[in-house]
């Protein structure tokens, strides 16, 4: 007997904002979404700040969004957790940090600090780096090197020079720390097995290979002069003495796992085969658990378990579920949706559609959405699933490029695909929910007219198709309880979200 599916469609990076000449969402032709908003119950959801477990005013992101959606509760995030530890002093007692620094003192080796150098708060925060430098000073370390991964996505594309200067000033103030390398996140924080990029980052940090410039601020300025912004700055070696060597200690201060895995594995995994290199031992600290299978690492802030999230609960009830996305968002509908657990639950199937191999997604704003859509429709029509969780990556990934015309095309692509998935769901007698995890494509320009590549704090939509009812405004944590509500299932007690359906 065919199942009647409840399908959750997550339009990654699709926020709500007034029409403007930089709003790709309103500039796009969206006949499907226009029709859905007109015909079905809809509301708005908060996807940022305190409502998703982030500091007040902090923009949401895909990891946080999917964790809250899948958890059915506000999940306290790593950024405020670590920041609070700095405030209360427990940060400086952290076992993994202390082990890394004590090993340097015992062996006479160097401490390397690396991560995304910005205050964007998505992958890291510069204040956490400053706290590590303070800790290194307090412990009397002298050989401390910083490898700066420039951002340009979660903050302005040319803010990196200012962050590098700020770091230099902090090092001078503390009397500890030297910048060893500078490079764009494009190289050091790949997540799509583009090993040629990762190797450039590795070679700069380990072998001292790449461009050379003894002044890190000037190095970034020179890149700007060549028309290359923060994200894409090619690796520059600043201090040739700052290469990573045998028995050195490394603290990777990024707390978001997905873009931290590849460069970490290249250093710590003896069986790594992404490119040719020789393995050597280090004391390596991952700020959070990047991957449960990662060998030879310490974890500074182990993940707090999200028990009885939607995936686990559906499985315990004997329900079947499908998770489907292209590469760029596959971890989000699986690992993050399951609360940071790699485990695949009984009854949970997964479909990964490869993302296109292009340098930047403005070159192919459709990405792999049509393939994701077709595979999803096929699975819906199979009648095999009670719940389907689907992500369309386009509005976010193309929004990050800052190219407005491409973002418009991305929105239009998603609109077409949403229509097909909703139609297939309704034809099976099911219910479709259309929402987003955070904003991005609705705000493509900075006030000065330069490209806006970061996420936003705007509200996101929630449309309930196939069930005529009244909805209240809410937050991402309310989606899972709403799914359970339309399925006639009680919420587990661990979920503190509430159904969006007005009773």
PLM features: what roles do these ranges have?
Residues 1-503:
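Feature captures the catalytic ectodomains and active-site-proximal regions of enzymes
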